[in-house]
């Protein structure tokens, strides 16, 4: 199988999409093995069998690397992708065809009345490939495999190292475990990672956006949790306690879509915080009011530091604490017209997770606190990272009953530090060349965007120079189930760039790839980009990195 023409690329992509590689599934494991075997079948890797490798991960999954190296050449472009996809439940009656592009399109055309108007037009045009993973991001992987094949045939004046990972859609464990391996490969093969070229798809800024983009960085994300411990009471005596659901609702009111958290950098703006999870922690119905609840928010960043954002979130928690008691006092006064009574005066305490650990040790003792933590970790069961983080906070808060009511600010995996190579000289020069080439060759006005908005594994390629202690010191699972590469022996600093395919509706049942651009323009554009990165002096990007 060759991977150069439009038909060949379509066949390759279809073969990748047909693997239901949903994060955490058997299909995710199987696709890594399939990629390994189709690469091993190439004459180049038959001659260099040790240069294509499946790297087993701690959880039984694997990531794959494939190196095509020129003799006595160090400069290497890293091609990054992920091969997992989100689930297919949203396809509904089309679920069984979600990973079969041809069958899915036929079914869509048979039931056009079920399609939104712009989706129907695209389906009828014949220019769009539908199916889970067609856009995000198996098309990008497909084109990168095509570039690797060109490298096998001596097309580039330098080395290509392809790495494709699982779990990008959930916790990015694949990339987190891959970073130390990349560091080791640099030493083993005597190569220098000059730049990383990701191929995540370009995202529409609004429905119907016709502009085409490439990215010189990737947006940052933290998952901020607020654990609320109220005071339980019977529903017949509501003023004797404090409902934890009331507490989280106030945090939600203050934080959801709060434009104060939006960050503007060079005309780009982060979306405001949005809630991703909210629930009380009662396990069964009763007439006891909920006394523990949690709410988790997706908060995005660009240049804002971890410590600055942490302080903003802490301030919001403190504001919520004041508003909660102000609200309760007002409603208490409203009720006193019916039944005069002396209300219980109390304030809501606000702690960070790190402070909660110290408070628990003070209240219950160091040994009891450690025992509670060890027991929780030993009996995690099937809890995911979000729920287990909440459980750890809850266990520690239970040792601090006298401090209730309280709000605890903590962080849960995954953490995506923002990265930008806009000012790296190598990336700056290459970006300018890409725009000029696209305009001259194809009449396309490619627009440069500093931060890829969809979150990506590029976040883990500049950890050597990133400070995230404000998050990790308040993350219950950090270094106990979730970690980030750190130190000079593990962390990397690599300039980044994202040039990817065009499509619409990622993570929706109408996900689709625009084939004319992705199969006819992108391969040439990506080839040009790789050549531009390799042809420039190795020192061009090195000077800034050493400062």
Curated annotation (Swiss-Prot):
GO terms for molecular function: hydrolase activity. It holds the Pfam family Peptidase_M20. It comes from the Bacteria. InterPro entries: Peptidase_M20, Peptidase_M20A, Uncharacterised_RocB. To B.subtilis RocB. This is Uncharacterized protein YqjN. The gene is yqjN.
């Amino acid at each position: 199988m060759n991977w150069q023409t439009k038909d060949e690329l379509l066949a390759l992509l279809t073969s990748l999409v047909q693997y239901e590689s949903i994060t955490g599934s058997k299909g995710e494991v199987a696709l890594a093995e399939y990629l390994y075997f189709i690469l091993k079948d190439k004459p180049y890797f038959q001659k260099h069998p040790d240069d294509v490798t499946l790297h087993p991960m701690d959880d039984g999954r694997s990531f794959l690397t494939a190196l095509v190296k020129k003799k006595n050449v160090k400069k290497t472009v890293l091609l990054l992708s992920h091969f997992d996809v989100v689930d297919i439940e949203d396809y509904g009656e089309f679920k069984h065809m979600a990973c079969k592009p041809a069958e899915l399109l036929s079914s869509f055309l048979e039931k056009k009345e079920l399609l939104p108007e712009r989706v129907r037009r695209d389906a009828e045009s014949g220019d769009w490939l539908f199916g889970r993973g067609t856009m995000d991001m198996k098309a990008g992987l497909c084109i990168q495999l095509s570039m690797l094949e060109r490298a096998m045939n001596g097309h580039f004046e330098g080395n290509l190292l392809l790495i494709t990972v699982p779990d990008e859609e959930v916790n990015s464990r694949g990339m987190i475990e891959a970073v130390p391996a990349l560091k080791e490969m640099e030493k083993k093969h005597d190569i220098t990672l000059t730049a990383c070229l990701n191929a995540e798809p370009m995202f529409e800024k609004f429905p119907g956006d016709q502009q085409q983009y490439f990215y010189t960085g990737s947006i940052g994300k933290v998952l901020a949790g607020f654990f609320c411990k109220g005071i339980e009471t019977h529903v017949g005596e509501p003023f004797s306690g404090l409902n934890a659901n009331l507490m989280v609702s106030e945090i939600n009111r203050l934080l959801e879509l709060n434009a104060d958290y939006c960050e503007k950098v060079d005309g780009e703006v982060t979306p405001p915080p949005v809630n991703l999870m909210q629930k009380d922690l009662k396990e069964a119905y009763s007439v006891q009011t909920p006394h523990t609840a949690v709410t988790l928010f997706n908060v995005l960043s660009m240049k804002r530091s971890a410590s600055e954002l942490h302080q903003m979130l802490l301030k919001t928690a403190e504001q919520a604490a004041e508003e909660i008691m102000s609200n309760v006092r007002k409603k208490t006064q409203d009720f006193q017209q019916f039944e005069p009574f002396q209300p219980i005066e109390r304030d809501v305490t606000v702690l960070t997770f790190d402070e909660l650990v110290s408070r628990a040790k003070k209240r219950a003792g160091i040994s009891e606190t450690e025992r509670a933590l060890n027991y929780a970790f030993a009996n995690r069961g099937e809890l995911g990272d979000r729920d287990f983080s909440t459980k750890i906070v809850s266990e520690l808060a239970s040792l601090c009953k006298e401090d209730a009511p309280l709000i605890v600010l903590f962080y849960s995996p995954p953490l995506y530090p923002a990265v930008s190579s806009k000012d790296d000289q190598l990336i700056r020069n290459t970006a300018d060349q890409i725009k000029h080439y696209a305009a001259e060759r194809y009449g396309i006005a490619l627009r440069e965007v500093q931060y890829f908005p969809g979150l990506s594994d590029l976040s883990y390629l500049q950890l050597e120079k990133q400070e995230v202690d404000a998050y990790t010191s308040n993350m219950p699972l950090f270094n106990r189930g979730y970690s980030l590469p750190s130190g000079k022996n593990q962390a990397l600093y690599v300039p980044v760039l994202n040039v990817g395919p065009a499509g619409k509706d990622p993570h929706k049942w109408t996900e689709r790839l625009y084939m004319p651009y992705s199969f006819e323009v992108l391969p040439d554009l990506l080839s040009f980009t790789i050549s531009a990165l390799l042809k420039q002096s190795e020192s061009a990007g090195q000077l800034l990195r050493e400062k």
